[in-house]
Amino acid sequence: MVVAPAHCLRVISWNLLHGQAIPPVPNQEWTQTLISATTQMAVNYQPDFISIQEVDYLQPRSNNINQTKVIAENSGLKYWAYLPAIFGTPGESWKKVKNLEQSIITENSDIPESKSYGIGIATNQKIIKLSVKKLGRSIIGMPLLIPKDNGKGARFIYVKDEPRVALVAQLENGLTIATTHLSFVPGVNIFQLNRLSSFLKKLPGEKILTGDLNLPANIPSKLSGFKSLAKIPTYPSWGEKIQFDYIMARSSSVKSGQISATLIENNSKLNISDHSPIGVEIRFQ
């Protein structure tokens, strides 16, 4: 049962690209750039719940900050949680996280740890339980398109896949919301999506699945038992043509009218990340 104040909830999903300015700029002021983009996002979306991916924690490349905490504080959201997918830095040296449950960092346990990279959430709704789900990784990498350093055009680089995880928050209002960042390797991401959706179906309350699923053309709605609540391109941020980022609810809840949603328009460019945020206002019957 969903209870007040969650009869209406504004949910955002945002692949952060660790706060990288787009186009890239020399000597980026990482903390201030993230604060500025977050403040702009919060004014535009007025979120109750933010799902974030490609988040840094104490990384030298992004000014050694806890990006999840910075986003929560500058969005006016009291509760937050961060789950590392790896210790180290993607694309460089890293190792897998052996105990995901013990590696969660929240507003009540923000202690110095090794630098890491992963996913996070921030919300104004009290969190009563956090769960994690390992989703595995691809043994092969893929060429990915990234912006050129001079900000003009894009280039391909070969990227190895890293372990994929999901962070699931059960809220006091009865909702269960998951965030994840699935593999960019075709087929592997479908396997991960099905693994996560099966896990979520066993949890209590209405379930919302969010994140960068790396699947275009509304494929997640066709395969997972969850239905996308907004169809809008989110990638690349400098000229969106493909939807990789989703906010989804159980297909049965959407079909029965228990859940409906309205897209929140993105009225401004945030000037960070190669993904644009996606936001919906969800209504619960």
Enumerate the predicted regions with their spans:
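Beta-strand-turn-beta hairpins that frame and shape the catalytic cleft
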Residues: 3-12, 119-133, 142-146, 160-179, ...
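N-terminal, active-site-proximal structural segment of metallo-dependent hydrolase catalytic domains
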Residues: 1-116, 190, 194, 274, ...
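Residue-level detector of structured alpha->beta connecting loops
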Residues: 46, 76, 124-126, 204
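Alpha-helix-centered segments that form part of catalytic cores
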Residues: 112-118, 152-165
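Surface-exposed cleft-lining segments at the edges of enzyme active sites
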Residues: 22-27, 55-56, 137-157, 179-186
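Short, P/G- and charge-enriched loop/turn segments at secondary-structure junctions
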Residues: 104-111, 153-157, 232-236, 264-269
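Metal-dependent phosphoester-hydrolase catalytic domains
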Residues: 129-134, 185-208, 213-285
